[in-house]
Amino acid sequence: GTLNFLNGVPQFAISIGYEEKGEIISGIIFDPIKDEMFFAEKGGGAFLNNSRIRVSNKNKLKDSYLVTGGPKADSKKREGIFEEYTKISNIVDAPIRKFGSAALDIANVACGRFDGYWQWELKYWDIAAGIIILKEAGGFIEFIESNEKNSLKKNIIATNSKIHQELMGSLLKKNIE
């Protein structure tokens, strides 16, 4: 959401994740435009403005509403990402959305607005808070290992857990590796 913020696009958030001994134990994502605050603490559930949230119940990829992020200009995966987008677009009934804020995209999966999200080459600090919020809302997040050693970039799939394997199986193998 940094580029959105810098360019006046109202889709960005303040996102803070707290990690202790290698585990994220709390997180908060604040959307100042909509005045929405997502937060979670390990074992305490996930909330949106003090109301408990849960992921959606959709269990088929075809019926799912998905969101993704786009490739950076210097991404080695750029060509494959567009191919992947097209492949998944041909599976799902609803159009795939792209808003440009990883933190909000994960938060929106956590509260059931979307059923799944995937993106490659994210910075950890952009998704740390979303990890605990999604898990506490009943979702699943998977980190896909990069071939780049010691990379700060993260490849993730975040879902309601019911469509996770189907989405993972639909992504292009060359982008996962």
Functional labels for PLM-detected ranges:
Residues 39, 46-49, 68, 116:
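Short hydrophobic/aromatic-rich beta-strand segments that constitute the beta-sheet cores
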Residues 1-47:
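DPxDG-like acidic metal-binding loop motif
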Residues 19-23, 33, 42-45, 51, ...:
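Short loop segments at secondary-structure junctions
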Residues 54-177:
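An extended, acidic
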